[in-house]
Amino acid sequence: MVTEEVVLVDDAGRKLGTQAKSTVHTTTTPLHLAFSCYVFNSKDEVLVTERAHHKSTWPGVTTNSCCGHPGPGENLGDAVLRRLSQELGIEAGGVRLLLPDFRYRAVMENGIVENELCPVFGVVYDGPAPKPNPEEVSRADWVPWQQFSRLVAEGGAVSPWCREQMERLHELGESPARWPAGDPDALPIVVRDPQQWQPTLSSE
């Protein structure tokens, strides 16, 4: 069985090493590289998911469409497309960089810590209905973006990273279709080169 590893980074996003994903999330979680993705359709709806109830971090919590970790040496955009396929059965053709410099740290009630440099991407998808993988996602629903935005702004229960991301995304404008692209020069250093984040995989 192949051990899934995450990339450990410093504050600037320089690679420090790797660690098994199964051991990285503790009460002293080191800073590591991750990503978040928001899937939109042409009707300005966003795919909102509920995390599987057996997950070790924030089980059963409502959150954005998809999250994950690129493996050592894996292109960041490819990692986003890989997780969309694995978690939601979505075969997307490309990604759009939205928040290149997003970083967060959050602590669960049991003391387990999330501590990530976590660039945020957007994907437009109008294909077949998503097929959530029950190992990762307990449900997935299309929700009008403005409705979800209001829910979060009014204190609705969502994951801590989703709440912080939504505050930043709200500043980009009312319609996701009109948001400006993020500045790739603000990405963590380890994935700043276009060959390290622009996806090489495509379903198109």
Name each region found by the language model.
Residues V24-T27, K55-W58, R139-D141:
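A short local loop/turn or secondary-structure capping micro-motif enriched for an aromatic residue
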Residues L47-V48, T63-L99, F121:
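The catalytic Nudix box helix
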Residues E4, L33-F35, C66, L97, ...:
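Residues that flank catalytic or metal-binding motifs in active/ligand-binding sites
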Residues A34-H69:
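A glycine-rich, hydrophobic loop/mini-helix early in the fold
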Residues G60, P72, D101-E204:
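Nudix hydrolase/Nudix homology domain
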Residues M1-S42:
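Acidic, metal-coordinating catalytic segment for phosphate/diphosphate chemistry
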Residues D11, R51, W145:
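Residues immediately flanking
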